[in-house]
Amino acid sequence: MGQFRFLALIVAVLCFSVALFLPTADEPDQDSYSVPLNQSVNTSQPPSSEMVPSDIRLTPLPQPKRIHYMVKVGDTLSGIFAQLGVPYSILQKILSVDLDHLQLDMIQPGEELELMMDDMGQLSRLIYHMSIVEKAIYTRENDGSFSYDFQEISGEWREILFSGEINGSFSVSARRVGLTSSQVANITQVMKDKIDFSRSLRAGDRFDILVKQQYLGEHNTGNSEIKAISFKLAKGDVSAFLAEDGRFYDRAGNSLERAFNRYPVDKAYRQITSGFNPKRKHPVTGRVVPHNGTDFATPIGAPVYSTGDGKVIVVRKHPYAGNYLVIEHNSVYKTRYLHLDKILVKKGQLVKRGQKIALAGATGRLTGPHLHFEVLVRNRPVDAMKADLPIAKSLSSNQKTSFLARVSEFDHLVQANQQEVALDET
């Protein structure tokens, strides 16, 4: 009996000792990592490295991001997209919706592109910051296509008088007082038939230029419009004033510009196959896809004419617009000619109204040969067939009254400025 009790005591001691080394239900296994169910977890931040065993690697979830890219000299859109890892197929979709706007073809070094990437690393929105008050927005839709939107802040327009004397060339003298190269080009274009800028100007000749400039706060947006031009030369005074119809006249109200033509093609090719329609809807998606121009049924090789005097500012080949060109007629009017077979002028060339500038074609994305023609007033498309274009040769009596009042205001402004300068010099 005593021997049996002794053996039982030994067994009890051994069982108790083993139990001390067994893990309890509440003690985690050191070879596993788990999160209890139904417990709130902050998925935006991974657990600290102290909580995670060294043999387990955590990959953070992709997050939406914005990429700000400053365009450099020599950049191309395809090169920028490739550099940022955006497929060329996406660029094609964006260029397709940009066909009726061609904003992306006007990108310049120093301007900004903003790309918004979703949490899968795909481009969801492209924003082209054209200026501090203007931006073109391309947004990916549910079907994978892109839509276009243009946003603009009105800002404040101020009239500023730039005055100076000729010392060297007009271009150098004008930039010295604060005029930009673009403004100088507009002035010389308007006055080309009145002043020989290479021979007529002499040192000491005076100029006064009234410019309407856009500001956002105290920041100049770069958008401007020439309102009045005056040269006091040794041989006499020459001036030009912008009227409400977008054309320049001398101080007596006589036009300095030849009238516009509405049609860029011969009478035989003036059949319109698709008119201007800013509210045109896509037949499948139902989204508004504007048609910002007028399509003429032209065969390949039909002559295309400039509708007004101006300067060729764009000559380009586009995957959807085809071969196209843009003519700047003054600071208000521009015209575009798309799907051309052959372009007969060069960028920077001055052209006359009625001059043959191209041959119609079928380049780019289109269903058949035609000419797509656009008129832009202050960079906004208008219906070339209905818009109030500068086709009249003189001002009406009502127009002339308000015009002459503006001329008088300008003269008083110049006189006041000269008096102020004279006081400063005494």
From Swiss-Prot:
Composition bias type Polar residues, residue spans: 32-48
Keywords in alphabetical order, please: Cell wall biogenesis/degradation, Hydrolase, Metal-binding, Metalloprotease, Periplasm, Protease, Signal, Zinc
Q: How does the cofactor attach, per the note? A: Binds 1 zinc ion per subunit.
The listed locations are: Periplasm
Where is Zn(2+) bound in this sequence? H291, D295, H372
**Required cofactors, per record?**
Zn(2+)
The signal peptide here is 1-21
At the top level of its lineage, which domain of life is listed?
Answer: Bacteria
Annotated GO CC locations: periplasmic space; plasma membrane
Query: Activity regulation per the record?
Result: Not inhibited by metal chelator EDTA.
Q: Which Pfam families match?
A: Csd3_N2 (PF19425), LysM_OapA (PF04225), Peptidase_M23 (PF01551)
Up-regulation conditions: Induced by TPEN (N,N,N',N'-tetrakis(2-pyridylmethyl)ethylenediamine), a cell-permeable metal chelator with high affinity for zinc (at protein level). No expression under standard laboratory conditions (LB medium), but is expressed in minimal medium. Expression is induced by zinc starvation. Transcription is repressed by Zur in high zinc availability conditions.
Q: Its biological function?
A: Cell wall peptidoglycan (PG) DD-endopeptidase, which may act as a substitute for other zinc-dependent PG endopeptidases (ShyA and ShyC) during zinc starvation. Hydrolyzes peptide cross-links which covalently connect adjacent PG strands probably to allow insertion of new glycans and thus cell wall expansion. Degrades purified whole PG sacculi in vitro. It is unclear how it is able to function in low zinc environments, but that may possibly be due to binding zinc with very high affinity, utilizing an alternative metal cofactor or that it may function independently of a bound metal cofactor.
Describe its partners and assembly state.
Monomer.
Recorded protein name is Peptidoglycan DD-endopeptidase ShyB
Q: Which organism is it from?
A: Vibrio cholerae serotype O1 (strain ATCC 39315 / El Tor Inaba N16961)
